């Protein structure tokens, strides 16, 4: 029997899955790590952390499965969006931490680009806009703020490309990662844009010349890495791609109209389309399957699950506050109490902008806020307001997407850590009006990487590929009685950012003085 391995390098952990040809999970392993945040608005990671985690997770899977290494036919790596990419020298040695997707330090570069470049031309070529989220702005920060590093840089590699080189010795980049850089990638030609590289002052030689679709083979596994991983030398290593698109693939999205919200540290709500229009404020790049003809377009909140984690860590229930039997998990107790709070949190709103915001706001200086606080509000109200606030951000992106794509299926699939919460799934149904489905297997992007590996290795029938491996289960239906209330609150949510924008900017500028 033949098997494959899917890996997902995430922001806070790496996961590996060893999967059989029918999608059965044979082994799984994960390894956690932290993001370095040396200054407000900065977020970076050294790539060795990712590579060590990949080795550890895959080796743990192969050791647990005890298979003949020759039975494992392919490996595919999905990864977080690596922003700037990893600046490496000719020997592929990292010169500086990778400025990841949530890093917002390139605001001066954004301001300069907006003043000096033809933005309509940039949007038409790349299908994307200008914001410090995009990798090309972070590249310019490295060029201008770390000139010694820039002079030594031979390539700028996304996380999966760096790992793939360590495994195969080959330098390549997948189209989804290249397109997500924005600014320098021609989304129609599916190639680097020489005119935009020249206009922005980024040397084309820094971009890997070998562009592959996610399901194409980068190379065979080298003997050294093979021994560390418990795999056979020569095992096919696929190009892989961006995690949000991989999670969408895992969820069985294979046609326009279907849509998925991946809610982990951040939130990415996405769908498939044939063309991109940056005017709607969404991010677009070639999909991880059929990327020569299909685009993955998404909108997302920077700090979705991160807002929930932040609240739990800073304001969660202490042991003495637990109102039930001893031994109840404080997080579960908080969830239970929040479920008893009326929809709308008694007039309390939360703006989930803990590190600025991505689409469709696109403002690195936006700040998180509780609005409407009163003496009647307790921790349970605030916690529910956080869940609702992230969900309003989801709806905000869905409405922007509707302007671009039109009709959407009445079912929304949710993947990621948020899917563990029954309360949150119900809030999503009530706020968006969609039937909410989740994946029974709870494996997301790594499962998508494994599915892609199995397809590339010829292990799937057409029906298996069309329908995917996942088993979807219904989680929540919208409550019609709450529709008007949530529509009113969402309208108030939409008004908050424009009303507070100037104050957000004043506070941010005062902080940075």
What spans do the regions from the language model cover?
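Short beta-strand-loop/turn "lid" adjacent to the catalytic site in phosphate-handling enzymes
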Residues: 63-101, 129-133, 164-186, 210-215
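Active-site core segments that coordinate phosphate-bearing ligands/cofactors
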Residues: 5-6, 114-128, 137-172, 183-199, ...
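Glycine/GP-enriched mid-protein hinge/lid loop-to-helix segment characteristic of carbohydrate kinases
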Residues: 23, 96-122, 277
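N-terminal glycine/serine-rich phosphate-binding loop of ATP-dependent small-molecule kinases
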Residues: 1-96, 124, 152, 226-227, ...
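Short, acidic/turn-prone active-site loops that include or flank metal/cofactor-
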Residues: 31, 99-106, 265-267, 440-444
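A conserved helix-loop-beta module that forms one wall/lid of the active-site cleft
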Residues: 201-213
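Pocket-flanking alpha-helical
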Residues: 87, 108-112, 247-249
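Residue-level signal for inorganic ion chemistry
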Residues: 23, 46, 75, 103, ...
């Amino acid at each position: 029997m033949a098997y494959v391995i899917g890996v997902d390098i995430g922001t806070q952990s790496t996961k590996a899955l060893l999967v059989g040809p029918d999608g059965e999970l044979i082994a799984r392993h994960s390894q956690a790590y932290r993001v370095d945040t040396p200054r407000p608005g900065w977020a970076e990671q050294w790539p060795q952390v990712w590579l060590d985690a990949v080795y550890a997770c895959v080796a743990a899977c192969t050791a647990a499965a005890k298979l003949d290494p020759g039975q494992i036919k392919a490996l595919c790596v999905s990864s977080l969006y690596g922003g700037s990419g990893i600046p490496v020298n000719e020997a592929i040695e990292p010169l500086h931490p990778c400025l990841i997707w949530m890093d917002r330090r390139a605001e001066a570069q954004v301001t300069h680009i907006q003043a000096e470049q033809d933005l309509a031309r940039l949007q038409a070529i790349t299908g994307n806009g200008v914001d410090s989220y995009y990798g090309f702005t972070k590249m310019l920060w490295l060029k201008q703020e770390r000139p010694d590093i820039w002079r030594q840089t031979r390539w700028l590699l996304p996380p999966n490309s760096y790992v793939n080189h360590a495994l195969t010795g080959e330098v390549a980049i997948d189209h989804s990662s290249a397109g997500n850089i924005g600014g320098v990638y021609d989304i129609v030609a599916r190639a680097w844009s020489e005119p935009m590289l020249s206009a922005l002052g980024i040397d084309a030689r820094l971009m890997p010349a070998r562009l592959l679709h996610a399901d194409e083979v980068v190379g065979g596994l080298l003997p050294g890495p093979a021994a560390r991983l418990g795999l056979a030398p020569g095992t096919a290593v696929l190009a892989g791609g961006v995690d949000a698109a991989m999670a969408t693939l895992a969820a069985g999205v294979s046609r326009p109209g279907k849509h998925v919200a991946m809610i982990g540290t951040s939130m990415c709500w996405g769908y498939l389309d044939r063309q991109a229009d940056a005017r709607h404020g969404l991010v677009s790049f070639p999909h991880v399957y059929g990327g020569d003809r299909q685009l993955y377009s998404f909108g997302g909140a920077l700090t979705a699950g991160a807002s929930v984690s932040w609240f739990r860590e800073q304001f969660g229930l202490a042991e003495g506050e637990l109102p039930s039997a001893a031994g109840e998990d404080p997080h579960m107790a908080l969830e239970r109490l929040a479920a008893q709070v009326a929809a709308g949190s008694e007039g309390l709103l939360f703006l989930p902008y803990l590190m600025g915001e991505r689409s469709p706001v696109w403002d690195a200086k936006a700040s998180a806020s509780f609005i409407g606080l009163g003496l009647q509000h307790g921790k349970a109200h605030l916690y529910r307001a956080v869940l609702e606030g992230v969900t309003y951000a989801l709806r905000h992106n869905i409405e922007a997407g509707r302007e671009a794509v039109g009709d959407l299926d009445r079912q929304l699939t949710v993947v990621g850590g948020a899917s563990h919460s029954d309360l949150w799934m119900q809030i999503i149904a009530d706020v968006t009006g969609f039937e909410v489905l989740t994946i029974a297997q709870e494996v997301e992007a790594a499962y998508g990487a494994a599915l892609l590996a199995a397809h590339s290795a010829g292990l799937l029938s057409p029906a298996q590929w069309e329908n995917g491996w996942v088993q979807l289960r219904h989680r929540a239906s919208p409550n019609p009685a709450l529709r008007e209330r949530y529509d009113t609150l969402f309208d108030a949510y939409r008004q908050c950012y424009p009303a507070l924008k100037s104050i957000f900017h004043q506070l941010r500028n005062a902080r940075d003085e």
